[in-house]
Structures are given as C-alpha cells and as structure tokens.
Amino acid sequence: QITVFEKTPVTNNAAAAPILAKWDKIFAHFEDFSGPISLYSNVDPDAKLRKAAEDCEIKINQFHTDIFQNPKLYNLIKNTQATDPIDQKYRQDILSQFEDTGVQLEPAKRARMKAILDELTKLEQEYARNVRDNPEKLEFTPEEMTGLPQSYISALKKNAKGNYLLGFEYPEYRPFMELADNDDARKRYQIAFTRRGTEQNLKLLKQAIDLRYELAQLFGKASYADWVLKDRMAKTPDAVNQFLAEVQKTVAPLER
C-alpha cells in the first residue's frame, strides 16, 4: 500500500483531503497489524511467543522509520493544501512526524537517527523484560500471611525455613496487598514491587539518556528535552522548570 501511495500523482497545492484519507486508511491497517503484536510481547504467558513478538516489533519499528524517512512520501504530503481545520492539523501532524524522524537530515545523520531509534526500541524491550520477567522472590513468615485466604497460601512455595516465597506476578501481589493484615509486610512488598528490575534498568536508562542526547544533537538541539518539547504546549525546558517551581512553591507549605 505504501508503494502504491508513493506513486500517487500530486501537483503543488493539490487538495489534501483525498490524500490524507488514503494515508489514514494505510495507517489504520498498520495499527490493526502492529497493535496485537505489541500486546503479545508484553502479556502473553508463552516466553517464546513474547520473544517472537519482540523481534517483530523491531522490524515493524524499522519499517515505520523507513516510511517517515522517505523524502518522496514527505514531499507528497507537503505539496498538498488543506482548507478544513481538521485536515490542516492532521497534515501538520504527519509532516512533523516525518521531520521528527529525520527526513530532512543529510543521509549520514538520517542513517544515524535510524540506528538510534532501533537501539532505543531494543533498550525499551529489555527494560520491560527486566520488570515483567523479574525472577526475584520475597520471603514472608507465616505470621506475615495473616489475613490471606488459605486457598491463596496453599498455592505458594516455601523455603527451607518454612517461609513463603512471593514473586511479582499480579496473582500473587494483588491479593497480598489487599488482604494481608501486616502493614510492614505490605510496605516491604510494595517497595520491592515498585523497584523490581532497578539494578539492571538504571544502566539501560543511562544508555537511553545518552542516545536521546545524541538524537537531539542531530537536530541541533541542546538537549532531548529541547527537542521533544518543541511541538508541545510548554515549548521549552525553561517553561517546564518554571511551572514545576511554581507548583512546588504552592504545595510545599501544605506539606508541613
């Protein structure tokens, strides 16, 4: 469909509506295909299927980048003229996505942009795996299990000391947090749950931060925040920092 769309004859200032309608239809099909794959990669109980879905995600993201780094497609949309306000907004959003993917960059920078996006996708997947597939178990004494139904307790494994071992799967975590009587045990479980994967993921975050900084440099921006905020309401990091300072000034006295 993209190949056919790329060959669409368009003159300067051509009506945007029919072109945008074709584009929207293509990406509706694209999302129908890619959406379930993303779901499988995150929630399917079969580890092999999750891995296969992750491999597909990488290829899908590479294909997506190829589309939005294609100058022919970019110029096709750019040569249209929209009169309807909704079409104007949609057209500009599409053009911005092309530009944010580096369609206007010189070839070497465009290739580096694609490599960065690929690496960020892989880091994101590894980060999610470290949270989702975390094998760590917490140890709870029989006394700390007070309040939980016997059917729940009977399904748990014990260690040599006779204490119960609980992981981070929701069928284990949620009942404990909702029903266990021991406040300290619930607090310990909650802290461990929110910190799962932290040791490995801090390293991944550092890599992602470095890649995002390099990405911003490709576009001549001082930081990733400068780059990502340019199309958002705040526009600049200074505006965000000023807003946060005002919020802190307002709420800080209320915490005392």
Task: Indicate residue ranges for each PLM-predicted region.
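Zn2+-dependent metallopeptidase catalytic domains
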Residues: 1-256
